[in-house]
């Protein structure tokens, strides 16, 4: 097996090089707070920032270091859509419902991009657009039909179809059959974005306490008692923002999200000539299929970040790195021989209906089920949850308190994932033959 690892190879996320995990606030949580936020990712921090700005005393708790989970492990895509493709969503919930949710996804993008701008968060945000690659002619036609349908339904979309003979403008690859150039999408440095949120929450007086897992919660009069190994907190409100890391202390929420491991690699520094050849426009790419691969430049355009094989557990990150390196060089042969400096993993979470969910259950607020669109939608719905907590009429969204399905006997351990991934790959293979 070829040596693909650079001397400085690490299994920490690439993003942590510039944004190490922040120090925790006082390790002993306060005895009281207006709001306890469980989960210190982008969702919880977005809520905490909006709450502290409205005069609430907020404590953010995490079982690990702040932002240890998906918020600093994701691909750093800031998109304008949902995982559920528009045509599929129309078939599932109808044209009116699909149009409403698609427009809400655009609002989520605009809110997150506006937050970066207004808060002056230095996270290398760039409005690059996105190339959605079609692995087959049938998928290209599906992308084309989806675009026509979105335009007919008045969904804000700025896109064009790129036929196979022009795809060299986007990527040095011949494995695709064209794709869709979707403008108005961006990329960020995931670690620095999260770091910026932590800094702003703390500047407003909010506490962010790591290594303090929530082990229990109970109703007490008009509020809650939140139990941790480091003491209890009397809270007026509780917001669960744990997504793929939801603990057993919240069984109702845990039963409704499916944690799925995703994997990424980062290459060594590449020459400007090679970077320009691989991604001529410096634009991120994601495949349009059920088990996609994705590729993007890093924050300064000197490396390639590549991800995929979501849900497939090979037992060790070095083995996963070899698999991803093989996929990367299959897609872009020019990257043959390039070594890796990082391979890492993190958990995304899917809902059973493939849609995000926000609402309140037994008095506890929640927002989760991002289905791999958590940077914009999570930031937005974290803010909207904060507005709901303070009673602001602008809190309402079409995602509030929608039926949040689960399955019989499911308790949060996705024992069925291997077979689900195999089925999705079978569906992809069928589409590839069409």
Spans of features found by a protein language model:
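Extreme N-terminal leader/targeting segments of oxidoreductases
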Residues: 1-35
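N-terminal Rossmann-like FAD-binding beta1-loop-alpha1 element of flavoenzymes
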Residues: 33-60
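Glycine-rich FAD pyrophosphate-binding loop
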Residues: 53-73
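Glycine-rich active-site loop/strand segments that organize a redox cofactor
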Residues: 73-104
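Rossmann-like flavin
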Residues: 92-200
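Active-site substrate-recognition segment that forms the wall
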Residues: 110, 118-126, 214-216, 232-362
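Helical element adjacent to the flavin cofactor pocket in flavoenzyme catalytic cores
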Residues: 149, 177-236
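C-terminal catalytic lobe of FAD-dependent flavoproteins
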Residues: 314-316, 321-429
């Amino acid at each position: 097996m070829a040596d693909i690892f650079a001397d400085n190879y690490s299994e920490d996320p690439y993003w942590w090089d510039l944004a190490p995990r922040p120090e925790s606030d006082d390790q002993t949580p306060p005895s009281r707070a207006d709001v306890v936020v469980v989960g210190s990712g982008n969702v919880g921090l977005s809520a905490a920032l909006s709450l502290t700005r409205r005069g609430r005393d907020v404590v953010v708790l995490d079982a690990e270091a702040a932002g240890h989970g998906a918020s600093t492990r994701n691909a750093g895509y800031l998109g304008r859509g949902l995982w559920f493709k528009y045509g599929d969503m129309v078939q599932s919930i109808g044209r009116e419902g699909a149009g409403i949710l698609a427009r809400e996804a655009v609002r989520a993008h605009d809110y997150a991009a506006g937050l970066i701008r207004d808060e002056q968060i230095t996270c290398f945000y760039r409005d690059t657009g996105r190339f959605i690659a079609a692995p087959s002619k049938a998928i290209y036609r599906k992308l084309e039909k989806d675009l026509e349908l979105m335009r007919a339904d008045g969904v804000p979309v700025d896109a064009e179809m790129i036929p196979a003979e022009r795809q060299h403008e986007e990527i040095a690859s011949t494995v695709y059959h064209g794709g869709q150039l979707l403008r108005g999408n961006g990329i960020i440095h995931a670690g620095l974005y999260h770091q910026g949120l932590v800094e702003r929450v703390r500047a407003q007086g909010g506490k962010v306490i790591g290594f303090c897992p929530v082990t229990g919660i109970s109703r007490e009069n008009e509020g809650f008692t939140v139990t941790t190994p480091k003491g209890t907190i009397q809270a007026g409100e509780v917001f669960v923002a744990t997504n793929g890391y939801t603990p057993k202390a919240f069984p109702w929420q845990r039963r409704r999200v499916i944690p799925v491991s995703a994997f990424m690699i980062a290459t060594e520094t590449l020459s400007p000539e090679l970077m320009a050849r691989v991604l001529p426009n410096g634009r991120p790419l994601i495949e349009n299929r059920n088990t996609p691969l994705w590729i993007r430049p890093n924050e300064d355009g000197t490396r390639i970040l590549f991800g995929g094989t979501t849900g497939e557990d090979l037992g060790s990150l070095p083995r996963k790195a070899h698999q991803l390196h093989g996929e990367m060089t299959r897609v872009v042969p020019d990257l043959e021989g390039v070594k890796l400096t990082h391979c890492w993993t993190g958990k995304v979470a899917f809902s059973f209906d493939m849609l995000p969910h926000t609402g309140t259950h037994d008095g506890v607020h929640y927002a989760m089920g991002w289905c791999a669109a958590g940077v914009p939608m999570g930031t937005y719905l974290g803010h909207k949850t904060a507005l709901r907590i303070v009673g602001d009429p602008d809190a309402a969204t079409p995602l509030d308190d929608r039926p949040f399905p689960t399955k019989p006997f499911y308790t949060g351990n996705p024992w069925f994932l291997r077979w689900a991934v195999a089925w999705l790959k079978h569906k992809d293979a069928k589409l590839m033959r069409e």
